């Protein structure tokens, strides 16, 4: 067991890179299972990626990272996982990431792109770094329960290029409207014109 605030560095032979991890409260190294458990403000960094969460499990045998929130003394959920990949930051409830394939799976996530907020049920990070989103909401309202949103079935984020969504319907104050679109396109570049581009 490693005390809080210690940082360990381990070489992932399959990836030939360095994984750095730390935690504020406790680090437990299960040598037999080749697993490391990180408790309290846990952090993992590797090759341009960073994951922080209340609890993180490193499975060195399976080349996987698992992360989720933790409960505080009042039984409230705190320290939700935050996945940062280059300029993209995603907050979620739970995530799994494979350090070998670079694929990831996230549950109950939120993504902010300029003035747009995505609140989705699930997402998959592909090997090419695209993020595929399934079932959720798109809005420019920053409230937890937005005054209005577009209900989405799916969307794809291509880093530094674009965001494309499938069919979506407008909801206002929790009530669906007859307004809908077959798809939408959002530029996602450092130098871009802000705003949704709708089909003609």
What are these language model-derived features?
Residues 2-200:
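Structural signature for solvent-exposed beta-strand/loop edge elements and short helix-capping sites
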